[in-house]
A protein has these predicted regions:
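Acidic, low-complexity intrinsically disordered regions
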Residues: 1-244
Length: 244
């Protein structure tokens, strides 16, 4: 996770991790071979939580969840089936705890971006209509989304202080982005400094990277990004990455 926080709000972090760990649980589950129609056998698995976890996940009402999805050509096949399973689970959970649902955004096929989804059927229909193709412009898309969020944050603060909804961006990808690591680092640090300057609450924004598959060099890329973010930046909030 890229954590924009100082003290760490357990409720916020647990709610954030609850959604993100749906991805991890899907990837770790057994018997998840895709069927002949391209669906995933685990897509309809029931997700349950303890009473304590239920209370923590109620914190989802405090923020918007955005899945930024790598739809490059390398995501075709089994990886895309896993994306379907992850998002079906996530939609079910989000709808249970937050009437706003989730947003799904794509690196390449922006015509299929959807907002406030509470129906897993709509998620499946959207993903079924996409053929993964193209490169991995993660840096450019992350920059675009962070810039749009900061504009929204400023507008809300002018209307009423502390009224901007918190946001959690979960990136589903299988590889190293097209852009240099330094560009992604600058994008993240710039957003963190903007939040510092505007006295945003500690847990205003989070970014998590969920890596699907074991492509060479990917783990090293995000580990190095994490190390770079922890060093040499004069920030009032902690900034680090977490690779699921």
């Amino acid at each position: 996770m890229v954590k924009f926080e100082s003290s760490g709000d357990p409720g916020f972090l647990s709610a954030v991790d609850g959604i993100a760990n749906i991805a991890k649980a899907t990837l770790d589950s057994q018997g998840r071979q895709p069927s002949h129609d391209g669906s995933d056998s685990e897509a309809s698995a029931v997700v349950t939580f303890s009473g304590k976890q239920e209370n923590l996940l109620s914190g989802l009402r405090r923020f918007d969840t955005v899945f930024l999805i790598d739809d490059s050509d390398s995501m075709a096949g089994r990886k895309w089936a896993l994306v379907r399973a992850i998002l079906q689970r996530a939609t079910t959970i989000a709808a249970r705890y937050d009437d706003d649902g989730i947003d799904i955004q794509f690196l390449n096929d922006e015509n299929h971006n959807r907002s406030h989804i509470t129906s897993s059927t709509l998620v499946m229909q959207t993903l079924a209509s996409i053929t993964p193709n193209g490169s991995t412009p993660l840096g450019a898309q992350l920059q675009k989304h962070l810039r749009a969020y900061l504009i929204y944050f400023d507008e809300q603060e002018r209307k009423r202080p502390n009224s901007a909804r918190q946001r959690n961006i979960i990136v589903l990808t299988d590889g190293v982005p097209d852009e240099r690591q330094s560009m992604i680092k600058r994008t993240i640090v710039k957003a963190a400094k903007k939040l510092d300057k505007n006295d945003a609450v500690d847990e205003q924004l989070g970014i998590q990277f969920c890596v699907i598959g074991n492509e060479p060099g990917v783990a090293e890329f995000y580990s190095s990004l994490d190390n770079d973010l922890e060093q040499g930046e004069d920030l009032e909030r902690d900034v680090s990455t977490h690779r699921i």
